[in-house]
Every structure is written in structure tokens, then in C-alpha cells.
Amino acid sequence: MSVAGSVAASRAALFRGESHVEQVETLIEEPASRQVRVRLQGCGICASNLPVWEGRPWFKYPFAAGAPGHEGWGHIEAIGDAVTELSIGDRVAMVSPRAYAQRDIAEADAVVRIPATLADHPVPGEPLGCVVNIFRRSDITAGQHVAIIGIGFLGALLTSLCVRAGARVIALSRRESALQMAERFGASSLIRFDDRAHAAREVHKICGERGCERVIEAVGHQEALDLASELAGVRARLVIAGYHQDGPRSVNLQRWNWQGLDVINAHERDPAQYRRGMQEAIELISTGALDPTPLYTHQIPLQEIGTGFRMLANRPDGFFKALVDCT
């Protein structure tokens, strides 16, 4: 193993549930043979982590220090003896399990180098990779009507990619600031999703009773899934990009059958696909084809991470993505 410097302790966030998180010191771990240790610059706060912060009976508390952070980026400071494709000092994005911390260990195969062209940019690789993977599995082509339900970080970037592919994006959100962001990213139609029946009528005014060729559900709630089913046309593709974690869902299978829908769970779990998505996202950002910068709306010091989660829970006007400063 090669090590840059010698450090005895590091700092991490410890989640105890019921909106309680504290700062703890942890011993520095050494990477195994095919691992790297990264000195983190930052980590995105993922909406899927909100229930962990709020507290749920099915979670076991306290979480491991740094968990469930998984959107980290920073510089490699130690490598395992079988890692030959990466070097100490490389700036990387990664998928790792405990990135709400100053340091985390990642598998070498879950790490992507960040080019020098993005030296001054935050790069939360995991959600950026999710966007690209969702887009790939959505099979978007020019001229399609694409309804995107939920314009958060994922929904806004998916809007950009769909518009770039020549699709006509119908953006649906409860928040006016989210619809404004969708318009900035190229959406051709903006619809408030305060009432499901009203939203469905407005969409059908645009694309007719035949419905949309593609519907991307990016909320993770039952009502959004119900609306997605109503908007999808015959032989359409309904793409589930929202993270559903608070219990089983019910769907209108008769409608799905009658419409002949292709239903896609767009969350990749194959590590190789995770990495592929991150690599492609970083390339798109590096060339200017994708710009997430307007969505990085809040930066929070690690010691104040609870503030970031309160913002995520309340979603003040203009909020899209909070990044934790892990330095």
C-alpha cells in the first residue's frame, strides 16, 4: 500500500435518527488491496437519505460514521497494492458508503478520475451518473413528448438531456421555482402538479389523448406514479426514476396492460453501470453538453450537515441541491 502523509484521526457525521446528527472522530482506515482512500472535498446530500435523518423504525441506529453519504469527490491519499490505474493525488468522483466525512474508502472500480478542466467544479459523481443512466434507459428520440414528473436535481438534468436529444419536454412540479428551472433547461411546457386530474388534463391538451411516448417519474411517491400511468400513451415507456422506499406501491395493472406499456426501473445497481454513468456524465459536463452548476444551490459545512437536511425537508424557494463541504 502507498500512503501520502500520516493522519491518526478523521471527522465524520453520525446519524442517530429523529433529526439528530453529531460529529465524531474516527480512526483512519487503510485501503484493502483493490481500494483507495480519498480525502473528500465534498459530498452531495441525496434525497434518499432524508428518511435516515428524520428517523424510520426499519433503520438500525446509529448508522456507521459517515453513512449513508455516497456522493463524494476528492483527492486520493492512499491506494491498495493491487491498484495500478489510479495514483495518489488524483482528483476523483466515487460511489462509496460513508462519504459524509473527511475521508472514505472506495473500491477502485467505483472511482472515476475528474479531468483538469473541472478542477474548480464540485463533482458529486453518483447522482450525475444516475441522470445519465436514467436517460440511457429511457430511450429518448427526437420529436417525442416526454413528461418529467418532479423537477429536482435529477428531473432538471433529465430535462436538459431530453431537450438536447430533440424531445419536447413537459415539466411537472409543485414548485414554481422548479418549473422556472425546467424552462431554463429547455422544457417546452410547464405544468403545476397540485392536482393530479388537472395536471393530466393539461398534459393531454398538449399531446392529445394518445398520451406521451415517454414519462419519467422522478418523485418517488405514489401520487406521482399514478399520474405517470395516466400520462403514458399506447406502447409508451414509463420510466421510474424516483426512489420509492416508504412501503409497497399499488399500480393500475389493467391500464398498464391496456396501454401495452414498457415499465423501466431506471436505477442501475450493477457497479460497472454506476461507473459507466459517472464517466459519461463527467465527459458531458467537461464538454459543456451538460451543466449542473445552477442546481448546486447550497453549500453546507460538514459540522452543520443537519442544516442541509432541514433544507432538503422544507425545500425553500430556489433549493435544488445541497453540497457538504468536507474539508
Say what each PLM segment does.
Residues S2-A8, D226-S229, V234, R276-T327:
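C-terminal hydrophobic helical "lid"/dimerization subdomain
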